[in-house]
Amino acid sequence: MLKLYDVEVGSRLLLGTARYPSPAVLAEAVRRAKTEIVTVSLRREAAGGKAGGAFFELIRELGVRVLPNTAGCHSVQEAVLTAKLARDVFRTDWIKLEVIGHHDTLQPDVFGLVEAARILSGEGFQVFPYTTDDLVVAEKLLDAGCRVLMPWCAPIGSAMGPVNPMALRAFRAHFPDVPLIVDAGVGRPSHAAAVMEYGYDAVLLNTAVAGAGDPAAMAEAFALAIDAGRIAHSAVPLEPRDMAVPSTPVIGKAVFS
């Protein structure tokens, strides 16, 4: 089981709810993934009027836990206000905190992120911060009250997969007891399996499923890959070697003279 703050969940796949072809496709993807947590943008759905109300009803029917986010926020003030509105709407202290600092890369504004995390933690929120793989920033987020960290593996929506495996491995090694969720940049199930093999606790993704030719099938593929990566990590895979090592023992080999 994965423990996030005071909640235990069985699935290690967190699924975003944006950009699906239809509500029916989203619902089927959630079911096939067997996810227990979905992320929701309050700003996007609130702007949808009646459609937003239908969306919220669909989420309730699926019986999953909602992790609201502050997607699209570019300032501390904006992110804090959105988080407070989300708490009122969804009646949860959970918030996926995003403070975007760069329009092209959608890279987090790590200075604003830490400040917003400190404010929200002080007001009783349980913060899931979308951050980079910078260890110093991560330490400051923990000092600000975060008990979960969500480093990216590549820019949002890029589908590039882990662009800096060494940094992700170092992040895991530096925070062995902190729940770590890879967020952003995952494009294929093999990417998800790879980060789980590094020892990460979960993967959050959206575009890789919503933008697939068959989102429901892709959601299931990701769920299987995440499970496989987790099992592989627990099984302690072999480390790469520079030289060949024979897999067949030579004991008992016939000797010809």
UniProtKB/Swiss-Prot annotation:
Assigned EC number: 2.8.1.10
Keyword check for Cytoplasm: yes
Pathway(s): Cofactor biosynthesis; thiamine diphosphate biosynthesis
Active site: 96 (schiff-base intermediate with dxp)
Classification via SUPFAM superfamilies: ThiG-like (SSF110399)
Pfam families the record matches: ThiG
GO BP: thiamine diphosphate biosynthetic process
Keywords of the record: Cytoplasm, Plasmid, Schiff base, Thiamine biosynthesis, Transferase
Reaction(s) the record says it catalyses: [ThiS sulfur-carrier protein]-C-terminal-Gly-aminoethanethioate + 2-iminoacetate + 1-deoxy-D-xylulose 5-phosphate = [ThiS sulfur-carrier protein]-C-terminal Gly-Gly + 2-[(2R,5Z)-2-carboxy-4-methylthiazol-5(2H)-ylidene]ethyl phosphate + 2 H2O + H(+)
Entry's Gene Ontology cellular component terms: cytoplasm
Subcellular location: Cytoplasm
Entry binding sites for 1-deoxy-D-xylulose 5-phosphate: 157, 184-185, 206-207
Top-level EC class as recorded in UniProt: transferase
GO molecular function, one term: thiazole synthase activity
Function description: Catalyzes the rearrangement of 1-deoxy-D-xylulose 5-phosphate (DXP) to produce the thiazole phosphate moiety of thiamine. Sulfur is provided by the thiocarboxylate moiety of the carrier protein ThiS. In vitro, sulfur can be provided by H(2)S.
The family this protein is said to belong to: Belongs to the ThiG family.
SUBUNIT field: Homotetramer. Forms heterodimers with either ThiH or ThiS.
Protein name per Swiss-Prot or TrEMBL: Thiazole synthase
